[in-house]
Amino acid sequence: MTNDLYAVVGNPISHSKSPRIHSLFAQQTGEAVEYTAIQAPLEDFAGTVHHFFDHGGKGLNITVPFKEQAWTLAEHRTHRAELAGAANTLYLDQEDQLVADNTDGVGIVRDLRDNHGVPLKGARVLVLGAGGAVRGVLGPLLDEQPASVVVANRTVARAEALARLFGREHSGIELSACGFEQVEGPFDLVINGTSASLKGDLPAITADVIRADTVVYDMMYSLQTTTFNQWALDHGAVRVFDGLGMLVEQAAEAFFVWRGVRPETSAVTEELRTD
């Protein structure tokens, strides 16, 4: 029996953990899946996608810098992809129409709620950043019914635009926006959705957003403690998590969308930590 073909598309892509994750899922579930990494030319993402599906490919994951292009390219979008304005998962429906989905938000919610036991319902949440990473996760976070969510960003107008967009769908939740300097804590949960940790930088917020019982979550991940999580630990936080679990959970949701089988994730996350 031949394996069904899947891949992750990005540029650059050599660093991607997705092939490793999906090969572990395939081993665990017994699904006949072959999963590779494809570096698409920056100027021809669409051609790369069409070539993949024209040659029998079954599904794609999409990473930077192509998530918005994937959303635009699709003929149909799931509701969560529509809200996210970006897609990290593509597949063909029964009519061979390209469908865009976004599993990032489900990924962070499952990691926080199920893997780390973080209560989201009724929580006071601070989300740092207003780019594509944050837009991709806000909908599923709000679906968990936190008491309030503050979106803080260097450019306040971008945070305000997100608050307006998601406020229409979640009118029962206090959703507000501000600049980094205007944040007033403390919070039950602080999520860093900026890429500052990758550059060794920090968002310009003060430590009063953190109490000892504040959960801090950096959507970036690394072998060492991320810059943001180290800052949080230095200012009294006890529970800090990086985004590796989110990466595995969003991959598991994509696997489920494609195959109808939901892989078990904790062993895969542990294996990646020790790779």
From Swiss-Prot:
Asked if Amino-acid biosynthesis is a keyword of the record, the answer is yes
One Pfam family in the UniProt entry: Shikimate_dh_N
Quote the pathway field.
Metabolic intermediate biosynthesis; chorismate biosynthesis; chorismate from D-erythrose 4-phosphate and phosphoenolpyruvate: step 4/7
Q: Which GO terms describe its cellular component?
A: cytosol
Enzyme class, broadest EC rank: oxidoreductase
Q: Which family does it belong to?
A: Belongs to the shikimate dehydrogenase family.
- Which taxonomic lineage does the organism of this UniProt entry have? Bacteria, Pseudomonadati, Pseudomonadota, Gammaproteobacteria, Pseudomonadales
Q: Which organism is it from?
A: Marinobacter nauticus (strain ATCC 700491 / DSM 11845 / VT8) (Marinobacter aquaeolei)
Q: What is its EC number?
A: 1.1.1.25
Q: Which UniProt keywords apply?
A: Amino-acid biosynthesis, Aromatic amino acid biosynthesis, NADP, Oxidoreductase
Q: Where is the active site?
A: K67
- Asked if S-adenosyl-L-methionine is a keyword of the record, the answer is no
Q: What is this protein called?
A: Shikimate dehydrogenase (NADP(+))
Positions annotated to bind NADP(+): G129, A130, G131, G132, A133, N153, R154, T155, V156, A157, R158, M219, G243
Catalytic activity annotation: shikimate + NADP(+) = 3-dehydroshikimate + NADPH + H(+)
Q: Which NCBIfam families match?
A: aroE, PRK00258.1-2
Q: How does it assemble?
A: Homodimer.
